[in-house]
Every structure is written in C-alpha cells, then in structure tokens.
C-alpha cells in the first residue's frame, strides 16, 4: 500500500486471514463483510477476497454482497482445493459472477498444482516452495491472530480451525534450566 501511495504503483493483491479476523463488530463478533468492504475501498473491486476464514459458502456470499458480481477474484486457502474450487465456481456462476476468478493457495508446489489440472482454478498463490525450492525442507510457520481488543478471534474454516484467545506457554525444565518440552 505504501509503494502505491509513494510511487503511483497500482495496488493489487489479496489479504491474510488476520485482516478478516481484525474486523469485529461492537460485540467482538467477526465481521467478514466489514473486512471485505475495507479491502475493496483500498484496492477496488478487482481485488482478491479471501473467503475461507470462517465458512467458504458464506464467505463467497458475503464477498458478492459487498463487491457485486464484478469482483476480481476469490481466494481459497483450505480444504480439498479441487472439490472446493468446483463448488465455489458453481456458486459464483449461479450468482452471475462468471468473470470472477478463483485463486488457490495452501503450501502449494508444482505437484499440488498439477493435481488441480482440470479444476476451475485461475491462479495459484505459491510462497514456501518458491523460497525454498521443491523438495527442500520447510518450516510450516503461519501467523495466527488470536485476540482483538480483548475479544478472542479464530479461523473456523474446515480443516484449519484455530482457537481464539491469548495463550501462555507452560514449559518443563531440566534441573540445569534447559527447557525440554511444553505442557
């Protein structure tokens, strides 16, 4: 966003689950529509909305309600991407969003992408494998927002549920003071 402002580079892209989780109503309840509206206000309707923070079907409905059928793309980051992309394509087409693209991500590499051949996927978000290269060991570390202004927040998408609220680490130590495990 800063490069766009400073250098006149058109802003584009998607958002993280933490962006969606940051948007809560006055009762601390998730407000996915507010997150989508904020992203569209900044990036326009041609942006890519991440629709699987909570419920994918509802996320697509919310995206279309906020952006209309001219939405640039939706991104799916969880579940069986082939099955989910087919379901989402059907939902988009039934709503008249024929030109809305489907982008998938989720630790993709060339093998996972090849497995999606034939599915209605228009683009791929590849991160880890681009940095490390195929077959190299990786650490699957992901930032998870768990609380906003004292209210627990959590991703509830199928297969990637998180638990909201602050956490404390309880560690077991050897007599020498070396940590040996977490309880």
Go through the PLM ranges and name each one.
Residues 1-98, 110-115, 119-120, 132, ...:
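Buried, small/hydrophobic-residue-enriched core segments of structured protein domains
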Residues 50, 75, 102-105, 125-127:
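Short, conserved beta-strand edge motifs with alternating hydrophobic and charged residues
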Residues 93-95, 100, 108-183:
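Gly/Ser/Thr/Ala-enriched C-terminal appendages of enzymes
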């Amino acid at each position: 966003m800063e490069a766009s402002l400073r250098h006149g580079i058109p802003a584009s892209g998607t958002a993280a689950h933490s962006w969606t989780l940051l948007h809560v109503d006055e009762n601390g309840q998730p407000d996915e529509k507010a997150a989508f509206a904020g992203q569209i206000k900044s990036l326009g309707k041609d942006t890519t909305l991440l629709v699987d923070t909570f419920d994918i079907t509802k996320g697509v409905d919310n995206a279309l309600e906020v952006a209309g059928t001219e939405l640039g793309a939706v991104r799916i980051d969880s579940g069986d991407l082939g099955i989910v992309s087919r379901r989402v394509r059907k939902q988009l087409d039934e709503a008249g969003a024929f030109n809305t693209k489907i982008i998938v991500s989720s630790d993709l590499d060339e093998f996972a992408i090849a497995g999606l051949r034939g599915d209605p996927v228009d683009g791929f978000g590849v991160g880890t494998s681009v940095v490390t290269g195929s077959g190299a060991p990786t650490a699957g570390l992901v930032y998870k927002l768990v609380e906003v202004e004292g209210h627990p927040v959590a991703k509830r998408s199928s297969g990637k549920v998180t638990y909201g609220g602050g956490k404390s680490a309880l560690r077991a130590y050897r007599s020498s003071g070396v940590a040996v495990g977490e309880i």
